[in-house]
Every structure is written in structure tokens, then in C-alpha cells.
Amino acid sequence: MCFSYCPRRIRNMLSNKSLTPTRGFMFQGIRELRGSRGKTALIITTVLLITTMVTLLSSLSAGLSFQSASALEYKVGSNQHLVLNDAGGTVSLSTGSLSDAQAREVESHDGEVVTMARSKDSDGQSFIAMSDNGNKPSEELYLEHQPIHWMSTEEVEKLPGSSTFGVVSSDAEPIAGTVMLKGKEALNASASYKGEQSSLNLMIVLLYVISALVLGAFFTVWTMQRLRGVAITVALGGSRSSILTDAVGQALVVLIVGISAGTLLTVGVGGFLEGIPMDVSTHTTLIPAAILLLAGLLGAGLSIIPVMKVDPRKAMNS
């Protein structure tokens, strides 16, 4: 060692056994988390709030999707085509009603012609009447945020403003004068689905990007503040891989605690928001949580680059 000529402050740091690389896995990282309780609480709270925002938006997006197009998704399914009249411009259920000739073509392709109409019940509540052809779903479905009342085709046709669309198998031949839509394109025929989902999904993606930047900034500041301790660890023989493991492990602990708390908060809050169309499920909580964990680790990983390039002598003298 250099105890005979090193400056006193460096000798004191080198004599501090808590900084040696032989104290166990993530010793220094855990010690810093405990020693900086204020900073630890701040970044965990930040992760918690970001997680809550993302999971709440994901749950809201899924809930709005169900109220916008669940009936259409039920009718079309995953391996069938939605058939609408090609009226030019943007195709939707309101503008793409089939003609009688096109409806007969759909039936000739072993397809189903669905009749629908907007109406109101005796209490003045709006609903959409839709022909069920004797096959009603077990749960209440919606279209464009209005509940579906299943009726026979004859009953729906008696209502004013009725329109029709077709459903055929995915291998059916094209029908002249129509457009055939599948998957997300079919759901976009709902007037409310496309606008809601595109805006909400954009917000969620932006939150993922923002979370990576915010967490990266937090960990960058945190990392720069611990450069001297890292330099001493390197000077005492600590390997760069152990330093990397320690830093990533530290970030992982913070992220897991914050993301878990944010996810649990969303699950708890979602149970009380009965008037808001939210679908709190594993798909809307665990998947966003996993993406946030990866985004946070990416931001933390980028912040560790200066640590891996640190010169022990320069860092200790700074």
C-alpha cells in the first residue's frame, strides 16, 4: 500500500474496511441505500408514481377498448373478416352499411349478416340493438360505449336507422364493392376505438421513454456521487465486474421495490373506481411492470458507464 506517502484523507479512506471488496455480494450498494435514506425514498417514490401512472393508463386503455369494440370483437373473432361497404374514404360501421345485394353475397360465402341499430329504452338510456342469430354471449358487451341488446334480426330491422355488416371466414373470396377487415383493422371500424387507443397507447409509450430517462438521470447523479468510493474499491483490488454487479443490483433493488408498490397501488385503487371503465388484470399490470423494469435497468446501465471507465487516482484526488 501507499500509507507512507499518501495524503491523510486517502489513507483514511483506504483504512475504511467497509469499502473493501471482500465484504460480500452488494455490500457497498446496500450500505449506500441504507445510508442515503432520503435519496433512496425519493427514487423509490418516483418509480412508484411512474409505475402507477403506466399501469393505470394500461388498465384504462383496456377498459375503454372493451367498451368501444367488445361486441365487434365477439362477432368477428380472431380468424374472420369484417365486411363493410366500400363507400370511399374512412371505412366505419356508421358509413359502411351493406346493400341488399352485398348482404346476399355474404350469405352465399357462408357468412353472417349482422343487423344493428341505435335506440333508447323506456328510461331514455341509449343502447345498440344487434342481431344475435340465436347465439348470445354470456357477458354484457359494448360497442362505442353503449351496451348491446341482443335481438332477432326482424326486431332490429323494425328500429329506425338500422344498418348491416358482414362476417366471413378469413379464406373467403373478396366481395365486389366491399372492404374486408381483420384484427385491429376490424376493431378500428368502431368510431371511438381508434382515437382512444392511439392516443392512450402513445401516452403509455412516452411514459416508458420518460421513465427510462428519469431513472437514468437519477442513477447517473447517484453514480457520480459514489465515484470516489468506487475508485477506492478498484484501488484495493475490486474487479470491474463486481462493481458492475453491485451497481446493477442496487438499481434492481430500488426498481423492484418501487414497481411492486406501484403495481399494488394500482390494483388497490382499481377496485374503488367503479364508475371508470378500467380493466385491472395481469395483462395490464404485470406486462407494464416488466417493461418498466427493463427500461429502468437500461437507464441504470447507461449511468454505470462512467464508473467502468473511472481512473482510481483521479477520482480519489477529485
What are these regions (language model features)?
Residues 252-297, 301-318:
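Short helix-loop junctions at transmembrane helix boundaries
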Residues 70-128:
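Membrane-proximal extracellular/periplasmic loop immediately following the first transmembrane helix
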Residues 1-41, 303-318:
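Feature of multi-pass inner-membrane transport and sensor proteins
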Residues 80-83, 136-192:
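A short beta-strand structural signal in non-transmembrane regions
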Residues 176-213, 220-228, 233, 248, ...:
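Peri-transmembrane interface segments
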Residues 43-53, 197-217, 254-258, 262, ...:
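Alpha-helical transmembrane segments of integral membrane proteins
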Residues 39-41, 52-80:
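Alpha-helical transmembrane segments
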